[in-house]
Amino acid sequence: MKTLIARHKAGEHIGICSVCSAHPLVIEAALAFDRNSTRKVLIEATSNQVNQFGGYTGMTPADFREFVFAIADKVGFARERIILGGDHLGPNCWQQENVDAAMEKSVELVKAYVRAGFSKIHLDASMSCAGDPIPLAPETVAERAAVLCFAAESVATDCQREQLSYVIGTEVPVPGGEASAIQSVHITHVEDAANTLRTHQKAFIARGLTEALTRVIAIVVQPGVEFDHSNIIHYQPQEAQALAQWIENTRMVYEAHSTDYQTRTAYWELVRDHFAILKVGPALTFALREAIFALAQIEQELIAPENRSGCLAVIEEVMLDEPQYWKKYYRTGFNDSLLDIRYSLSDRIRYYWPHSRIKNSVETMMVNLQGVDIPLGMISQYLPKQFERIQSGELSAIPHQLIMDKIYDVLRAYRYGCAE
């Protein structure tokens, strides 16, 4: 990460896409996409997804590392080209607890990530805990971030410190996505970004972390990009020029969250304006969902009724029976809920792919389609971009490859923006 940031600060148009997903097919796609390049791939886990207690994936940081490395070995992607990051590391998962208990767990969380070899650490102590004022004072956020940084430094080896990098910043979207419709978004003011940096510098120095400050590579701000279930707020470069100019006088770049669904031109403009770390998650699993839904429609027409997976029906049944991952995000009417379950850009389906019933139905569908020749006309109908690539000889009409290429479409836009 430090090398990439140095190149960007030296004037090169270069950025990196941060893949925020624990889905094996998304990780496989991210690694396979860059297998034949010289680029490094940044894969991040969030604190609620992966933590010392397992998170909602059931994986500790060490488990996640091995999970990613196993996929890399299968794909033929060199492990040393993978950068592992931890996102929203702090009290995010324990906001209902008092600050002492929440921070104690947060310290162990950060230590677990660093011990597992994660080298990009987002120190995010912006969440209020039980009894805290809402919002927290910037000084309090910075002091807690310094506690987390101290924890990271205390377990890092000398070799790890050479690679270790920190991201600071409090102006981040709700981890997991917006819960309501959006019409506009607040772009970070320069004075707020400057205050975030100033308060963190003061807090770090007070804890004897002056050297660690040199490892702070980025600050999280809101450049004016966001999405909800069916709306996308697109990047308006002219609105972020004050931010773009301010960061030029520092050693850092910006990290932009929720960049999903922007145009490839917007990604290029974001990187030009020093938002050099572009985080993406739901757009990748949304592309995966689109591919699976398309294949399910193809299966419906090609496979005898008694042998079909019933994949789409199974997904709806499970999500309606177990609504905990979407209930507080989606609309309440039955028809509206079904539309959101299927097609929301927030893509809460991503939390359900590991469910045994859904996983088994998808596997059945894949086996069914591997045993038949999919007519080109059907691929043109349901996966038109993939049809074009099949016609040009770039792609085969194999279900797994069709899913991979659908995810590649998202990664292609980021590659264009991050140029190298």
Swiss-Prot record:
GO BP, sorted A to Z: D-tagatose 6-phosphate catabolic process; galactitol metabolic process; phosphoenolpyruvate-dependent sugar phosphotransferase system
Record flagged with keyword Oxidoreductase: no
Pfam families for the chain: GatZ_KbaZ-like
Pathway(s) the chain acts in: Carbohydrate metabolism; D-tagatose 6-phosphate degradation; D-glyceraldehyde 3-phosphate and glycerone phosphate from D-tagatose 6-phosphate: step 2/2
Keyword Ubl conjugation: no
Matching Gene3D superfamilies: Aldolase class I (3.20.20.70), putative tagatose 6-phosphate kinase domain like (1.10.400.20)
Gene Ontology CC terms, in alphabetical order: plasma membrane
Superkingdom, natural source: Bacteria
Keywords per UniProt: Galactitol metabolism
InterPro entries according to UniProt: Aldolase_TIM, GatZ/KbaZ-like, GatZ_KbaZ_carbometab, TagBP_ald_GatZ
PANTHER family: D-TAGATOSE-1,6-BISPHOSPHATE ALDOLASE SUBUNIT GATZ, N-ACETYLGALACTOSAMINE PERMEASE II COMPONENT-RELATED
Family classification: Belongs to the GatZ/KbaZ family. GatZ subfamily.
Subunit details: Forms a complex with GatY.
Protein's job: Component of the tagatose-1,6-bisphosphate aldolase GatYZ that is required for full activity and stability of the Y subunit. Could have a chaperone-like function for the proper and stable folding of GatY. When expressed alone, GatZ does not show any aldolase activity. Is involved in the catabolism of galactitol.
Record's protein name: D-tagatose-1,6-bisphosphate aldolase subunit GatZ
Protein species of origin: Escherichia coli O157:H7
Gene name of the record: gatZ
